[in-house]
């Protein structure tokens, strides 16, 4: 199964990625095991840690998950950099979930065997921000 996930660092920065193993990937980002993105390892070296805020599931294949990941990052970058990072990500996710598909070349959400992407919340703060966005 493929997932797109959102991490938040103890310094409040955020990171969006895609994986097939959520727990292993978080351990990699926190340098508990080898692997992980360079951007997240810098924060860990500075004494910070990463926590998963939410993940999105229901993708029919890896390609579709990667398209969603790209679009999540793209839509999040439309907002001012001085905005609280988690709010920027939630606004981007809200836009993305309101579309018919994640990119112009991806398949329609309604054609996913699961019925479309589903957000699994792991942070009440993130869920509250997401639900407050109209």
Residue ranges of model-derived segments:
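Generic intrinsically disordered, low-complexity segments enriched for polar/acidic and small residues
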Residues: 2, 12, 26, 35, ...
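Residue-identity detector for glycine
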Residues: 17, 35-36, 47, 58, ...
């Amino acid at each position: 199964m493929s997932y797109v996930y959102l991490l938040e660092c103890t310094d409040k920065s955020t990171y969006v990625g895609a994986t097939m193993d959520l727990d292993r990937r978080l351990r990699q980002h926190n340098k508990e095991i080898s692997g992980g993105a360079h951007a997240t390892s810098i924060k860990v070296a500075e004494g910070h840690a990463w926590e998963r805020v939410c993940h999105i599931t229901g993708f029919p294949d890896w390609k579709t998950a990667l398209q969603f990941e790209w679009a999540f990052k793209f839509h999040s970058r439309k907002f001012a950099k001085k905005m609280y990072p988690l709010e920027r990500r939630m606004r981007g996710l809200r836009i993305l979930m309101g579309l018919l598909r994640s990119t112009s070349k991806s398949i329609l959400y309604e054609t996913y065997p699961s019925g479309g992407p589903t957000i699994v919340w792991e942070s009440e703060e993130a869920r509250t921000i997401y639900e407050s966005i109209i």
